[in-house]
Each structure stands twice: as C-alpha cells, then as structure tokens.
Amino acid sequence: MKASFCWERFEALPIVGILRGFPMRLLPGLLAAVRRGGLRTVEITMNTPGAAEQIQEAVQLAGEELTIGAGTVQDLAGLDAALTAGATFIVTPVVNEPVIRRCVERRVPVFPGAFTPTEIQRAWDLGASLVKVFPADVGGPAFIKALKAPLPHVKLLPTGGVDLASLPEYVRAGADAIGIGGPLFDRERIVAEDWPWLEQRCRAFAE
C-alpha cells in the first residue's frame, strides 16, 4: 500500500513515538499495543538493524491507522531507502541540507534536528515542517519558551528526555509537538512482550 502523511491525524495528537533498536519479531505486538493505546505517529530510526524492512512491515501492518516515519536519517542514501520502504515523514539528527532539500522537493514532511536559535531558524528556512529541538532536556521547557519568544513562527518538536511528568510543561512552554523514545518504549518491558503495560503507557501519554 502507498501511505501518505496525514497532518489532520498528527495535529490531533502531535506525539512522535520513537522506536530504536527493537527486533523485527516484536513489531506486530508493539504496533498493536501502540494503536490500542491511542498513539498515532511512530518513527523507526534508520540505525535500527533492518530499519528499511521494519518500516515496510510497519506500513503494511498498521499504515492505515498509524503514521510511520523514519528517524536518524543522515544522508541521501538513507533517505531514499526510507522513502522506498514507505516512510511518510523524515527526522534527521542535525541540519542536513541535502536531505532537507530532497524532502522539500518530494513534498515529504521533514523534522530536522537542531539546538541553537541559528540552527533552528536555518532548518526552518530550508523548508522544515517542524524543527526537532534535541537534546531537549539540556534546556528543558524553559529553553523552549525562550526560543519561542524570538521564533514564534517556527514549529518546535522537543525530543530527548521528555517524560510523562515533563510533557505538560513542554506543551505550556509552546512546543508544537513532542518526540518520545525511552520514557515511552521501555526496553525491558517490550523485550518481555508486556503489551498490556505498553498499551497503558501509550494511553497515559495520549491523554
């Protein structure tokens, strides 16, 4: 199936769940728990073994209900592999101009990683749909609020260290979306296939 990014779905619940390094065999149960828990957007990082195959499988398993994207995209080869696999949005760790420009050309939403005001504005000027502020926990919600003062036009996606307790603070600070990895996808629980726990965890973040 050919999936596409749905802004309406994303804006209704602007949380990106970040999957990094989980084996393919866990994907069906994991995605089912995420769906039941109410989350709608999942990023599979390209430094996961077999990432392209996982993205393709995720789109086939859940692409009608979940928005599936690729993270940690570091070059054009990785971008092409992710898009061929069916990723509908792209996240980069840094302001990678060739990747951003290619995404803009192909009308694929791209969320580049940046930290300083100069990097953030540069990513936005290149055509970023959102700018991933990483690592967000270095500055916390106060940093997001400070960035929004001179850069209110830039949509920010703080990522890194955001947990259930701090999420509301980031939203109040002006975050337009939130990226969550480890605090949502606890490795020990997932490897143990504790899907009821994951469903409840996703529901807690979604609410």
Give the predicted meaning of each segment.
Residues 1-88, 105, 153-156, 164-165, ...:
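Conserved N-terminal beta1-alpha1 strand-loop-helix module at the mouth
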Residues 38, 62, 86, 94, ...:
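Conserved functional loop/turn residues at catalytic and ligand-binding sites
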Residues 46, 72, 93-95, 114-115, ...:
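Short secondary-structure boundary segments
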Residues 75-85, 118-126, 143, 162-178:
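Catalytic cores of alpha/beta
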Residues 89, 93-138:
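Histidine/lysine/aspartate-rich catalytic loop segments that bind and position anionic ligands
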Residues 89, 93-99, 133-141, 175-195:
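Glycine-rich phosphate-binding active-site loops on the catalytic face of alpha/beta enzymes
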Residues 99-103, 121-126, 141-146, 166-169, ...:
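Short, charged, surface-exposed secondary-structure boundary motifs
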Residues 103-104, 110, 141-151, 156-158:
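CoA-thioester-processing core
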